[in-house]
């Protein structure tokens, strides 16, 4: 009887180690949905002096997001190299960090450091999001936490910081040298890692030992930076679903083999993650790629049988979030609302009052919106949080800042136990309702509906979207107007800038330089390391660039013309930058 009671207590103890409903254990929280199970009491307003519970200093920046399990928050960072363009330092000094912070006090409980596995891709000078040094969000199963550091591998620690194992998943480089950013997820006894840049692979690792259980290689992973999601098909089947370049894939998470695929959006890159509603999955991509809804399940090519709708709504880097029958996505300072039943655009709201983060506000939309109860929270790159009340029409409640200092926010916030956690380039912040009155910096909401003027049917794209076709940079050729001046012709810097600025937002990003053979030299014009080149930076630096003989392009860029890009977008058999010849898709399950 006594022995039986001990086993009962032990079983209960082990059960409590699992992730609770109010935890935020992975990128975008429970099931990767971006929807908080708890946290209803998270305040709608705060300031650096009100409703700020604590802030914790971080050892360096990162584009990863925080997670919260129990009373502990975890976040990854990097230091030692690539912090500034003027003085990047020595790559041998690059270190990744996993930091654990007490959720009650903000005290750092422990920090684990991982030295870079060399050779590592060098800092490009265009910002933290362009190299992947700390872009993957860790995942926790309630017992251990697993962090992916690109070429430096996957590392497992217990919740007290004890290192358990490390596993390599690849040491290759994607042609753009951007690195990967897909975050690991956990399933049964496995950690599943998408090593798109490191080995064009999806890898299943044993959570207890780090042993590789399966690996599927596919060059179709090139140009994919989103995180896969687990979709329950029925009681006996769960699919691992991801959006890659121009396709949706449904894999068997037990072995990585492909169960089904569907033609998806027109984008040659997939930055954001899918969202789901039961078995129905939604993907929204950028670069004029559009959006799609597909019912997961089946086998083989399910494009004709399972596609529910296609639409013109587009994203940039942030992933969409679903609430009831609506999808919400933020791109370039505009919040778009999409009907989940039809794919039609319901509303477009321009976010007003936002501050610039080096470049134009709205361009650095890396954080994804989240849902807490009946409110939508969106954090921009300058650390301003827009809070909306959800309903038939969106109503902006507040616009908040957590710091007056100049810090950059690239991670998606986490919500757990009535607390909201944000990471910046310097600190981890925790906001909770302390009963303090806040004079919110609210901004009026501009209704910028374009439902009548913008085509939203299949194949349409919203006004201002990038035109498709062989002439644009993503097809492999240089963007129109982006070639170097020919001999004997007058050189107009703004004409060149306008040709590179495909989305006409007044800035040139790394994505817009993709396929341009001068990309690496043009990136040096980004003097403030904000991930984009402004008109001022371009006009100031371009003449000097040409006078130094800058017309010779990078060997990583496309050769120009009809689709000769070497960036390895993973679609249509592009050059793989001397990588092994791999299949386009994972092995099909029989």
Where are these regions (language model features)?
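N-terminal hydrophobic targeting signals that begin at the initiator methionine
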Residues: 1-3
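Bacterial N-terminal signal peptides
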Residues: 5-18
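Acidic Ca2+-chelating loop motifs
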Residues: 502-513, 528-538
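Generic alpha-helical secondary-structure signal
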Residues: 516, 540-541
């Amino acid at each position: 009887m006594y022995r039986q009671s001990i086993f009962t207590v032990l079983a209960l103890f082990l059960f409590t180690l699992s992730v609770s409903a109010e935890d935020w254990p992975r990128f975008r929280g429970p099931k990767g949905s971006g929807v908080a199970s708890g946290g209803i009491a998270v305040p709608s307003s705060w300031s650096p002096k009100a409703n700020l519970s604590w802030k914790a200093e971080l050892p360096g920046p990162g584009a990863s997001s925080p997670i919260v399990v129990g009373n502990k928050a975890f976040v990854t960072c990097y230091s030692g190299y690539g912090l500034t363009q003027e003085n990047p330092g020595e790559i041998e000094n690059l270190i990744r960090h996993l930091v654990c912070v007490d959720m009650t006090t903000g005290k750092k409980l422990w920090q684990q450091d991982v030295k870079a596995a060399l050779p590592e891709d060098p800092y490009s000078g265009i910002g933290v999001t362009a190299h992947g040094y700390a872009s993957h969000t860790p995942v926790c199963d309630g017992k251990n936490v697993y962090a992916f550091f690109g070429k430096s591998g996957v590392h497992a620690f217990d919740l007290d910081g004890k290192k358990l194992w490390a596993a390599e998943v690849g040491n290759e480089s994607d042609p753009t040298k951007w690195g990967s950013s897909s975050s690991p997820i956990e399933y049964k006894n496995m950690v599943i890692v998408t090593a798109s840049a490191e080995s064009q692979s999806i890898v299943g690792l044993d959570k207890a030992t780090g042993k590789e259980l399966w690996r599927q290689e596919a060059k179709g992973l090139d140009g994919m930076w989103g995180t896969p999601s687990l979709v329950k098909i029925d009681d006996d089947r769960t699919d691992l679903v991801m959006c890659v370049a121009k396709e949706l894939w449904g894999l068997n998470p037990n072995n990585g083999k492909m169960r089904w695929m569907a033609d998806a959006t027109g984008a040659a890159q997939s930055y954001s993650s899918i969202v789901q509603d039961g078995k129905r999955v939604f993907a929204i991509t950028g670069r004029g790629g559009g959006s799609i809804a597909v019912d997961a399940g089946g086998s083989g090519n399910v494009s004709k049988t399972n596609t529910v709708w296609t639409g013109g709504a587009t994203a940039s880097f942030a992933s969409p979030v679903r609430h009831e029958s609506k999808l919400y996505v933020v791109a370039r300072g505009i919040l778009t609302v999409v009907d989940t039943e039809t794919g039609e655009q319901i509303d477009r709201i321009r976010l007003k009052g936002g501050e610039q983060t080096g470049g134009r506000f709205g361009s650095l939309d890396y954080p994804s919106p989240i849902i807490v109860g009946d409110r939508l929270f969106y954090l921009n790159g300058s650390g301003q949080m827009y809070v909306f009340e959800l309903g038939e029409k969106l109503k902006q409640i507040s616009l908040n800042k957590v710091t007056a200092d100049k810090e950059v926010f690239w991670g998606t916030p986490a919500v757990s136990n009535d607390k909201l956690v944000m990471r910046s380039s310097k600190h981890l912040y925790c906001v909770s309702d302390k009963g303090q009155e806040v004079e919110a910096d609210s901004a009026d909401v501009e209704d910028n509906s374009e439902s009548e003027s913008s085509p939203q049917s299949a194949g349409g794209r919203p006004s201002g979207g990038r035109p498709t076709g062989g002439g644009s940079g993503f097809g492999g050729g240089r963007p129109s107007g982006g070639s170097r001046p020919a001999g004997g012709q007058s050189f107009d810097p703004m004409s060149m800038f306008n040709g590179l600025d495909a989305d006409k937002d007044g800035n040139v990003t790394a994505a817009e330089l993709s396929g341009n053979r001068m990309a690496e030299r043009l990136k040096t014009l980004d003097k403030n390391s904000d991930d984009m080149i402004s008109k001022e930076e371009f006009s100031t630096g371009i003449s000097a660039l040409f006078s130094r003989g800058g017309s010779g392009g990078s060997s990583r860029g496309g050769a120009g013309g009809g689709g000769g890009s070497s960036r390895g977008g993973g679609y249509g058999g592009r050059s793989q930058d001397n990588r092994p010849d791999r299949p386009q898709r994972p092995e099909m399950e029989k």
